[in-house]
Amino acid sequence: MIPLEIIEVEGIIIDEKPYGETSKILNIITKDKGVIGVLAKGAKRLKSPLRSVSERFCYASFNISYKEDKLSILLSADVINPFSNIKKDIKKVSYLNFLSELTSGVIKQNDDERIYDIYLSAILKIEEGFDPSV
């Protein structure tokens, strides 16, 4: 049996998929662990505390019941930045989707922490109003 480890990790949700009636599976890009697959139980319920912290591109500090190479469980999260300015602009969302796919692919091949730092810096610049097409 794989031992469970409760960890706190800072990351950004790069993908979310529905799971059953009320839950979501999230892919979170992190500095220390690369990309983590996480089950957010009940996150689609209206009154769930995980509802607002389980949206795509949410930058947060996540408390996770971690299982290496398996689906982990999201216990709670504290939002650092929801990147609301990006979510209001379809062009910025498109660029961020592309950047997320690219970063996810690169991090699977090389879990260098600098990749996460560059990704986060790019998102912060886009959030501040930098034109991503430049």
Question: Model segments located where?
Answer:
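Non-catalytic alpha-helical scaffolds and adjoining flexible linkers that form interface surfaces
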Residues: 1-24, 29-134
